[in-house]
From Swiss-Prot:
Gene: rplR
UniProt-recorded Gene Ontology molecular function terms: 5S rRNA binding; structural constituent of ribosome
Domain of life: Bacteria
Function: This is one of the proteins that bind and probably mediate the attachment of the 5S RNA into the large ribosomal subunit, where it forms part of the central protuberance.
Organism the protein comes from: Methylococcus capsulatus (strain ATCC 33009 / NCIMB 11132 / Bath)
Family annotation (Pfam families): Ribosomal_L18p
Record key words, sorted: Ribonucleoprotein, Ribosomal protein, RNA-binding, rRNA-binding
BP-aspect Gene Ontology terms: translation
The family this protein is said to belong to: Belongs to the universal ribosomal protein uL18 family.
Description of how the protein assembles with itself and partners: Part of the 50S ribosomal subunit; part of the 5S rRNA/L5/L18/L25 subcomplex. Contacts the 5S and 23S rRNAs.
SUPFAM superfamilies: Translational machinery components (SSF53137)
Record's protein name: Large ribosomal subunit protein uL18
Amino acid sequence: MDKKQARLKRAAKTRHVIRAMGANRLTVHRTPRHIYAQVISPDGGTVLAAASTLESAIRETLPVTGNKDAAIAVGRRIAEKALAVGISSVAFDRSGFKYHGRVKALAEAAREAGLQF
């Protein structure tokens, strides 16, 4: 089992537990250049809110999109969008990534902006 397969296996376990809870899920995906966040409905079929460093509103304000500052901006943006749709409580799905660095920065920024998890 290589590194990616191990991460995907961890992610599948987490998603199974979150689906059993029946909560909206804040999922995060990171690449070396960008970071993405989505709030997904409990059935797993509908994206209720999404934010990433590919959005022009975020991309124009940052010189680099693959660092903690970018993750903080995406965390604030996803919280704003989720609250605008009426979602205040979510379950955090780190997609098998370690809760460290950019993933942690995004989560903390979303909490500070009003999301509860």
